[in-house]
Regions:
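Extracytoplasmic electrostatic interaction patches
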Residues: 105-172
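Bacterial N-terminal signal peptides
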Residues: 9-17
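Short, solvent-exposed polar/charged micro-motifs at secondary-structure junctions
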Residues: 16, 79-85, 139-146
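Terminal processing/anchoring signals of secreted or surface-associated proteins
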Residues: 1, 23-24
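C-terminal motif of bacterial Sec signal peptides marking the signal peptidase cleavage site
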Residues: 18-22
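Bacterial N-terminal signal peptides that target proteins for export
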Residues: 1-9
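Short helix/turn-capping signatures at newly exposed starts of structured segments
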Residues: 24-121, 125, 129
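N-terminal cationic leader/targeting segments used for protein routing and processing
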Residues: 3-4, 32, 147
Length: 172
């Protein structure tokens, strides 16, 4: 149990650095996305299969989410991370894998607020909102789970233009 706690803490620390750098206040990109019009017509979820490998995620991204490009692959003593970006508007996906087993344990997807209606409709249609979980519409803060409750999806606004969707797996 302690091992999973340390992985969770590591994921949160890594997410903090991604949050603070993924949605910068670059004036040019802010002007591009200040419109109220969505930049997508439908949303594709990032790869989120528990215990998947780095190669599984790379294959999915190159096939299903090919508007994203691999912008970084890092490794340290406890984890491997893949960072994908679109190259515009601070959108990106961060995958985290355990170094020991090479299995996927966390996904953070940074999306544009203007696409929120499309994304939240998808999440509401596919997942169950967790009853009693803290909810804040202004901050786009929601919590969802899949049918077998093996995954928790949380969302939160991280800037005026971006919000994060965090996929975390639950061990039973």
């Amino acid at each position: 149990m302690k091992k999973y706690f340390y992985y969770a803490i590591s994921a949160l620390l890594m997410a903090t650095s991604v949050i603070t750098t993924s949605c910068s206040n670059d004036d040019d990109s802010l002007n591009e996305i200040r419109s109220d019009k969505p930049t997508i017509t439908h949303w594709v979820e990032p790869y989120h299969v528990k215990d998947a490998t780095v190669e599984d995620a790379k294959a999915y991204m190159s096939d299903a989410m090919n508007r994203y490009a691999l912008s970084g692959e890092t490794s340290n003593s406890s984890s491997i991370q893949l960072c994908y970006t679109t190259g515009v508007n601070d959108e990106g996906v961060l995958y985290s894998f355990t170094k020991h087993t090479g299995s996927l344990y966390s996904i953070i997807d940074t999306e544009l607020v203007v696409n929120g209606d499309i994304i939240f409709k998808y999440l509401n249609d596919k997942y169950d909102e967790v009853p009693g979980a803290y909810k804040n519409e202004a901050r786009l803060q929601y919590t969802f789970t899949n049918q077998d409750k093996s995954m928790v999806i949380t969302t939160v606004r991280v800037s005026d233009v971006c919000f994060n969707i965090d996929y975390s797996f639950i061990s039973k």
